[in-house]
C-alpha cells in the first residue's frame, strides 16, 4: 500500500500541482475568456485528436512489453523504435498540418499558420525523445525524473496562460502559445538525457524485420487509442457537424476540462499500478494483484464521488462566468465514468503483459463505437447533456467488457464478482448525485462522516 501511495503521489499529486494552480486561477481566467474561446479550442481539438492515435502508431505498447521480455537487450530494439518514430513524426506533422488548415474555425482564421506551427514543432523535433525518455524512467520505477519534468512543464504552461490570457488579452491563442512553451521545455530535456546521459540514440538505418515485429504488436493498439478520441473528442466533432452553436460547444468543452483533470489522476494511478501489477503477474502472485486492484478501486471511488458531491459548490466559487458556471451537472456526469476505471486498468495491464493487444482492440472499439453512434443519434436531438450521458455509458462499457468477452475474461480474475462490483459502484453514484443536490451543511456533514469512516478502515486497505 505504501509503495502504491508513494508512486501515485509522485505520478499524480506532484504533476497535479499545476492543475491545482490552474483551477485556482479559474476565477481570473474565466473573466477574460468566453464560451466562444472554449468553442474554438474544443472544435480544433475535436479534429486533431481524431488523428492523434496515429502519432506513435501504438509503439508505446511494444516499448513496454520489450522492457520486460528482452532483458538487458531492450535498448537495442528501442534504438530501432526511436529511429522509426523520428521518420514517422515528420509524415504525421504534414498530415496534421493539412487537417488544421481546413478545419480551423472562421473565428480563428487569422491565426491559422501560427496554430499549425505551434501544434507540430515539438512533435517533429522532440516527440520520440519524450516518449522513450518518460517510458524509460517509468518502467524502471523511477518516478522523480518524470514527475518533476511534468511539474515544470505544467507550471510554465499555467503561468504563461496567466500572462497571455489575462495580461496580454490573447484569448484562445494564449492556450496554444502556453502549451507550446511548456511542452518544448519538457521534450527538449528528455532529448538531452536520452541521447547523452543514457546513450540511447536513434538508429536511422532500420531493420525492417524488427520494425515489422514492432508494428505487429503496436498497430492493434491504435483502435484502443482511437477509442479515446471516439469517447472524448468525437462528441465535439458531431456537435460541429450538427451546427451546434459555438457557445454550446464551449460550455461542453469547459465541463470536459474537469474530466481532463480526472484523466490526469487516472494516468497517474495507471503509471503507479501498471509496473507493480505486471511484476506481480510475472511472479504469479494473484493475491498481491488483488490487493492492488482493491486499493485502486477505493482511490477512484473516493475521488469521483467526492467531486460529484462538491461540484456545485466548486463551480459556484471558482467560475466567474454565468454561461460556464451552469455546467457543473455535465462535468459531474463526465467524471462519473471514471469510477469504473480500475476494472479497465486491471484487465488491460494483463493484456499488455501477455501481449494480447489484439483483444484490447475489441474492448476499445466497442466502447468507442457505442460513444460515436450514441453522439450521432442523440446530440442533434437533445444537445450537450446527452453527450455527457453517452460518455458515461462508454466508460461503463470499456470497464466491464474485458470480463465478459470469451477471449479476455480469463486473463485476469477479479477478487469479487463483476456483477457485485457493478451494483456497488452504481449505488455509490446514486448516493453522490443525491447528496450533491442537498444543502451545503448536509454535504459537509456527509463528507466528514466519510473521512472518519475511511480513517477507521485504512489499515485494511
Identify the role of each PLM range.
Residues 26, 55-72, 199, 255-284, ...:
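Helix-loop junctions and terminal segments of transmembrane helices
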Residues 3-61, 93-97, 123, 154-158, ...:
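Signature of the first transmembrane helix
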Residues 1-4, 112, 144, 168, ...:
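Interhelical loop/hinge segments that connect adjacent transmembrane helices in multipass membrane
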Residues 7-22, 153, 175-190, 194, ...:
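Transmembrane helical elements of multi-pass membrane transporters/channels
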Residues 147-196, 366-370, 384-405, 423:
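Hydrophobic alpha-helical transmembrane segments
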Residues 6-18, 44, 49, 53-104, ...:
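Membrane-water interface segments that mark the loop-to-transmembrane alpha-helix transition
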Residues 82-108, 163, 266, 290-341, ...:
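Alpha-helical transmembrane segments of multi-pass membrane transport and lipid-handling proteins
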Residues 125-148, 335-366:
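Membrane-interface junctions at transmembrane-helix termini in multi-pass inner-membrane proteins
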Amino acid at each position: 500500500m505504501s509503495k502504491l501511495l508513494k508512486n501515485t503521489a509522485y505520478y499524480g499529486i506532484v504533476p497535479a500541482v499545476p492543475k491545482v494552480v490552474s483551477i485556482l486561477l479559474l476565477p481570473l481566467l474565466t473573466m477574460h475568456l468566453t464560451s466562444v474561446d472554449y468553442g474554438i479550442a474544443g472544435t480544433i481539438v475535436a479534429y486533431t485528436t481524431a488523428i492523434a492515435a496515429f502519432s506513435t502508431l501504438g509503439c508505446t505498447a511494444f516499448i513496454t512489453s520489450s522492457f520486460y521480455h528482452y532483458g538487458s537487450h531492450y535498448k537495442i530494439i528501442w534504438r530501432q523504435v526511436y529511429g522509426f518514430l523520428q521518420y514517422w513524426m515528420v509524415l504525421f506533422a504534414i498530415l496534421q498540418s493539412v487537417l488544421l488548415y481546413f478545419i480551423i474555425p472562421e473565428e480563428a482564421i487569422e491565426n491559422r499558420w501560427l496554430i499549425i506551427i505551434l501544434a507540430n514543432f515539438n512533435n517533429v523535433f522532440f516527440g520520440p525523445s519524450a516518449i522513450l525518455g518518460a517510458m524509460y524512467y517509468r518502467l524502471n520505477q523511477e518516478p522523480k525524473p518524470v514527475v518533476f519534468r511534468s511539474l515544470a512543464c505544467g507550471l510554465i504552461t499555467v503561468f504563461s496562460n496567466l500572462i497571455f490570457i489575462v495580461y496580454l488579452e490573447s484569448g484562445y491563442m494564449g492556450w496554444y502559445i502556453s502549451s507550446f512553451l511548456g511542452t518544448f521545455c519538457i521534450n527538449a530535456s528528455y532529448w538531452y538525457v536520452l541521447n547523452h546521459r543514457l546513450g540511447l540514440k536513434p538508429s536511422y538505418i532500420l531493420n525492417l524485420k524488427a520494425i515489422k515485429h514492432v508494428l505487429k504488436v503496436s498497430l492493434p493498439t491504435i483502435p484502443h487509442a482511437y477509442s479515446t478520441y471516439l469517447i472524448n473528442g468525437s462528441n465535439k466533432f458531431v456537435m460541429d457537424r450538427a451546427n451546434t452553436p459555438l457557445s454550446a460547444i464551449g460550455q461542453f468543452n469547459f465541463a470536459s476540462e474537469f474530466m481532463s483533470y480526472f484523466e490526469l489522476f487516472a494516468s497517474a494511478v495507471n503509471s503507479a499500478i501498471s509496473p507493480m501489477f505486471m511484476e506481480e503477474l510475472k511472479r504469479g502472485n494473484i493475491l498481491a494483484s488483488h490487493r492492488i486492484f482493491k486499493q485502486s478501486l477505493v482511490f477512484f471511488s473516493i475521488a469521483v464521488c467526492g467531486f460529484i458531491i462538491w461540484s456545485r459548490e466548486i463551480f459556484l466559487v471558482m467560475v466567474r462566468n454565468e454561461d460556464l458556471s451552469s455546467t457543473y451537472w455535465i462535468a459531474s456526469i463526465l467524471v462519473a465514468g471514471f469510477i469504473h476505471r480500475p476494472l479497465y486498468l486491471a484487465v488491460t495491464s494483463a493484456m499488455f503483459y501477455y501481449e494480447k493487444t489484439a483483444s484490447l482492440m475489441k474492448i476499445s472499439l466497442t466502447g468507442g463505437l457505442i460513444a460515436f453512434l450514441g453522439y450521432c443519434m442523440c446530440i442533434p436531438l437533445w444537445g450537450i447533456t446527452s453527450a455527457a450521458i453517452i460518455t458515461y455509458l462508454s466508460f461503463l462499457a470499456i470497464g466491464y467488457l474485458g470480463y465478459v468477452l470469451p477471449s479476455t475474461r480469463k486473463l485476469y480474475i477479479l477478487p469479487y464478482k463483476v456483477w457485485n462490483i457493478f451494483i456497488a459502484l452504481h449505488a455509490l453514484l446514486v448516493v453522490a448525485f443525491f447528496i450533491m443536490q442537498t444543502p451545503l451543511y448536509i454535504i459537509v456533514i456527509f463528507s466528514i462522516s466519510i473521512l472518519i469512516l475511511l480513517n477507521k478502515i485504512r489499515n485494511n486497505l
